[in-house]
Amino acid sequence: MRHKSGGRKLQRTSAHRTAMFRNMSASLIKHEQITTTVAKAKELRPYVEKLVTLAKRGGLANRRLAMSRLMDEAQLAKLFDVLAARYKDRNGGYTRIIKAGIRASDAAPIAIIEFVDRDMGAKGQDSGPVTTDEELEDA
C-alpha cells in the first residue's frame, strides 16, 4: 500500500533530501526568511511547521525529537525559546510562501519562505566563522 508515502523526491536520494531539509530548516530558523525554489519551499513548509509545533509543546522528549530532525543546537535553542513563545497563541500557519519570479540561469520558479510575524533583524546574520584582527595579523 502507498499510504502516506507522498511528497516530492526533488531528484535526490532519501539521505540527500533529509540532509537538505535539515540544512534548510536550520537556515530558516536562523534567518527567518530564505529564498529557494517553489517545490523545495512547499516541501519545507510542513517540515518546519511540525518543528514549531514540537517546540510549542515543550518538554525533554519533544526537544530530543526536534534535535533528531534539526541537528543544530543553536537553532534548537532559538526554536524552543524564541519561536515557541512567539507562536504560542497561533494554531498552525507559522510560515508563508511568496512566489518571487524565475531564476535567470535555468528558469526555475523561485519563492521566498518566511515566518509569519518574523524578526526583521534576523535576516542576514553572519553565517560563517568570525576572524579576529589578531588572526589576520598572524596569517
From Swiss-Prot:
The UniProt record lists the keyword Ribosomal protein: yes
Pfam families: Ribosomal_L17 (PF01196)
A single MF term (Gene Ontology): structural constituent of ribosome
Entry keyword set: Ribonucleoprotein, Ribosomal protein
A single Gene Ontology CC term: cytosolic large ribosomal subunit
Superkingdom of origin organism: Bacteria
Protein family according to the UniProt entry: Belongs to the bacterial ribosomal protein bL17 family.
Subunit structure, as described in the record: Part of the 50S ribosomal subunit. Contacts protein L32.
PANTHER family in alphabetical order: LARGE RIBOSOMAL SUBUNIT PROTEIN BL17M, RIBOSOMAL PROTEIN L17
Protein name, as recorded: Large ribosomal subunit protein bL17
UniProt gene name: rplQ
